[in-house]
Amino acid sequence: STFGNGVEATVLNETGGREVLINDKLSAHQAYILALYRHRPELINRMKAIADYYSNKHASATGSIGDHVMILNTGSIKNVRIGDYCHICGTCRLSNGSVNSNVTAPVHIGHGVICDDFIISSGSEVDDGTMLTRCFVGQACKLGHNYSASDSLFFSNCQGENGEACAIFAGPFTVTHHKSTLLIAGMFSFMNAGSGSNQSNHMYKLGPIHQGTMERGAKTTSDSYILWPARVGAFSLVMGRHVNHADTSNLPFSYLIEQRNTTYLVPGVNLRSVGTIRDAQKWPKRDKRKGPNRLDYINYNLLSPYTIQKMFKGRSILKDLKRVSGETSEIYSFQSAKIKNSSLNNGIRFYEIAIHKFLGNSIIKRLEGINFQSNEEIRQRLKPDTEIGTGEWVDMSGLIAPKSEIDRLLDGIENGSVNRLKSINASFAEMHENYYTYEWTWAYNKIQEFYGLNPDEITAQDIICIVKTWKEAVVGLDKMVYDDARKEFSLSSMTGFGADGSHDEMKQDFEQVRGDFESNTFVTAVLKHIEDKTALGNELIKRIESIQD
């Protein structure tokens, strides 16, 4: 037996063609390449050969049980390798799999669980009647309450309860809690599924052949529905039923709302949502992985070259729509979606605010803590440390990296110079560690393009001008978030409080349960953020304003 290693999970396309060979060392980024880069057949063949080599190397005629393992009231365990300190209690059936438990991150498998052809990584809990067939479960995942999944991959910190998954690629922090939720043939990450969220990959023609992508941070509301194929942009919110196959990948931070069977797009509006900021803060805190060997390299940044490049594209798409259809049009058409005039103008404004914020952040970070004597010193400091980072960036299910570096790794796999799973993971680790170095190279080029600056002529005054714009953007955005949070304390939010009492009692009941707006921890954090960022900008301006030459 190979104990689950080498099992093919037919992710994304239920009928096959995007199979991922699961193994003990599978990372979200490896799986991303195996599933999506089918336009490079030599690469796929090499990666399959590397995975097969690993599977055969670890094959054995006998299973194994590690040290300090507890197995209690369990039905059948056949062809399974069980790691140290694992707890298996009341489990029905485990067949052909690996449980990669260890002392720092033990695995718990609980009552009524049935797993066939599976791998469960360190620190995970699979409990309460969960059923898995041909599945990979990453580190610190939690599956329970009768969750059922087939041909699916769950990477770090995913949670699945009550519902159902079929052929999904669940990148880090994909969360689904509700009985009525079906995730099928989709790629997700940093995603929260509302109750009754469904997708269809079948149009009753040639079978379940369709697939879709919700980019990082996308969320669905209750009873949302998407007919694949479709692609939803990063950090977007999907509300209602969407059947027209829109691709909003270049319009991130949007709302997709259905009105009378039509998809209406509100671009960029999620940038000012208090929920988006709260999500970005909570993910790093909810990383439950323990131990030194982490399989996935996760970048939590809300604004990165990946999302900002899309905002640049989104801004030009919206400006082109405005130019072609005329400024006075009430409704603009983008692919199969409609955009209202006010939404389009706001979208351009939101994207520009975010671009100012990101580029300003990058400059302030780059010039931090140095007392400059001349403009030439500033120019030298601004010059990037490496040429890597220009061009397009990709989000490989959690890892944000320049496409040039990904291509370099893929070329290495194709020509045979990279031929082990650990070497592939080491390349991802290197990209992750160098993220900020590469990010600055990208930002430096965009600063020149966006602000129309010549790198040999940048002066302290140019920097001061950018920092002032940055300050306006940051404070403006924070004020929008503050106002958005205030809505949660409005009179309509108090509906149902103060049962059987007067208006005053309603307010008192609300304050006892929810607290008051000004002392809310999130609200005070936003106000402190405004204060801190203003001080940060002022400090840089003060440090360089006297430079004249």
Which residue ranges define each predicted feature?
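Surface-exposed loop/turn motifs in large extracellular/passenger domains
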Residues: 55-58, 62, 75, 92, ...
